[in-house]
């Protein structure tokens, strides 16, 4: 039985690309924040922001106002789909394709950093209209 479990673990580890668990964890954090925005739950949305972001926006309501004003497609949208991701030494960069409430396409690039407790938190989000040069 122990051999079967070990074999299964080895097969799973070869089936997943390097960093796949980090990408899955990052996507879970981003999705949880997106859902918090949808519920207008400022405290929950704020909890996924890294400490450096929380220093800039020291209150959940201030953070939520900033997102509403500067990241409207992230705050409210028709679709929110994960794209390519990159993992490097405790950091994850995750692209997200967004269609806003008006039907306009956007691309967001989220960055996340591993925290001392092992969790990932969002360190930033860059937002461009789809097709716009960086």
Describe each PLM feature range:
Residues 9, 34, 52:
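Generic anion/oxyanion-binding catalytic loop in active/binding sites
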């Amino acid at each position: 039985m122990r051999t079967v479990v070990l074999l299964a673990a080895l097969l799973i580890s070869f089936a997943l690309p390097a960093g796949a668990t980090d990408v899955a964890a990052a996507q879970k954090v981003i999705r949880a924040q997106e859902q918090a925005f949808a519920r207008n739950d400022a405290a929950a949305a704020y909890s996924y922001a890294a400490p450096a972001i929380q220093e800039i926006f020291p209150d959940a309501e201030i953070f939520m106002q900033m997102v509403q004003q500067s990241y409207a497609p992230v705050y409210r949208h028709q679709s929110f789909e994960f794209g390519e991701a990159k993992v490097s030494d405790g950091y994850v960069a995750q692209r997200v394709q967004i269609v806003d409430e008006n039907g306009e396409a956007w691309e967001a690039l989220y960055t996340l950093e591993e925290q001392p407790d092992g969790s990932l938190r969002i360190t930033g989000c860059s937002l461009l209209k789809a097709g716009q040069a960086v």
